Amino acid sequence: MRRTIEYFGRIALISIALLGCEVSDFDLQDNPNFLTPKSADPEYLLNEIQYQFQSLMGLMILNTDDLMRYEAMTDTYGDLVSVTVLDTEWESYFEALNNSKTIEALAEKDETLLFHNAINKLLLGYLTITMVDYMGAIPYTEAVVPSEYPNPGLESGIDIYKKVLNDIDRAILDIENSTFNFSTDLFYDSDKDKWIAFANSFKLKILVQTRLASSEIGVSDIALAINELLEKDLIDSETEDFQYTFSTVEEPESRHRYFRRGYVSNFGQYMGNYFMFMLKDSKSVADPRLRYYLYRQSDSSPFSIVPYSTCLQESNVDYCYIGDFYRGLDHGESRTGFGDNEERTVYGLYPGGGTFDEDQFVSAPKTSTHLDGAGILPLLTSSFVKFLRAEAALMLSTGEDPEKLLREAIQDSMDKVLSFGEVDSDFESTDEEVEAYIDEVLFNFNNVATNEQKLDIIITEYYLAAFGNSMESYNAYRRTGYPSNIQVPIDNDNPTFPRSFPYSARAVEINSSLTQKLNTDRVFWDTNPEGFIK
């Protein structure tokens, strides 16, 4: 990974050049920000796509952090998933799509750009699958071709998934046949073997994601398709993890969003009590990642302010305060803003590049032992891939051992988190603590009766390992309904959980082919019944 100031300075200049005029309605009309093959430098353009990729993925993750209880949701689902929530993300995606098509056009005439275009197609494919997973049908083939399609129509998620799968296969071939590298590859430093491992793992993710509707995307035997992938290179070690690494640069702003939220100014959010409880108290041993994930700013009692002053006596509040100065809020708690910003628990060392918790009890902006925001965006790690393989082994009988994969998935997560930032502290977790944690999980796994109960354990551990990438949890929750003990909003026992996100209100206003959708609409691979999750 590269974190150089020179790169971010270059990105700033590119961004100014590309985005100097107001960005608007990328899927709909001619836009002076769009580059054409005649005006584009492929190196700079692929740099820009990498920047757009991490920015858009980071924003999408923020959109589901509170939905999935990592942060506390202090609104209703309807307020949280409103028609304006994806305005910025929608525009960013279609700018990236236009840049992607420009690189593709350049590569058709220049064989030295095979590797460039392969990276381009994989990054754009990942963004596209994310957009489909959040919204279902989106403009795709007709998008960013305003001369032919001034009001591009929707394309089904099924058709888009099929096209992305084809793009992955083509990208792998192009990587294998390419002879020229990309000079500023921010993910794998032009390591072609790692890009191929990512491409295969991305395909695995798609197959597991669609296991309830695999025939819709033309996969008649999903277990066979997955087994064929298992014979190929996959992400199976931390050195192959697909992640974006942030820097410590402030101008232009290049630090992790979690760090900017918790350490640059007073923390305006609350961590979710359910998530903190799961780390601290859901097993007989605390999660060894606890002090790496979370940082406590204060050792003061919370009971002098609302809601803590009353919520212990309120039957609808599940947690209120979990103790040991882990101060957060329950899911759906709307009583906020009582001046305790510097007493709340905030993001810690991993993944946002904050502070490791050594009982300092100092407000986050005043700490000096943090990583200055040089965190990571964990997108598809060896841990995630092994959780997906464990699910496939259990539910699709792929032939692998789900217990073994569960152990390896948790171990990979522990190794990654506990080595992050090279902590040297009396409070750092030990190998013995990790072993005790994993042993308890596997004991529970082997002492439940049904595969559904085993899947609940796999997905719950996936949920805990996916801190920093709530998209994985959001998808798994809709696909499986797990974790089964996830907290329901305290003010509503029967809420309408957003099974998808609405379209950008701005896009619907301008594009006559779009009609606003409901957040109860299910994406094609979510075949579970209405009211399945809360």
Give residue spans per PLM region:
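Sec-dependent bacterial lipoprotein signal peptides
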Residues: 1-19
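A generic structural signal for nonpolar/aromatic side chains embedded in well-ordered alpha-helices
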Residues: 21, 49, 225-229, 409, ...
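Membrane-proximal, proline-rich intrinsically disordered regions
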Residues: 21-79, 83-84, 91-94, 102, ...
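Extracellular glycan-recognition regions
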Residues: 24, 86, 482-484
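Beta-strand acidic-aromatic groove motif in beta-rich domains, primarily in extracellular
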Residues: 58-66, 136-139, 403, 472-475
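Structured, solvent-exposed acidic/aromatic patches
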Residues: 69-123, 127-421, 448-453, 533
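C-terminal functional modules
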Residues: 386, 394, 411-534
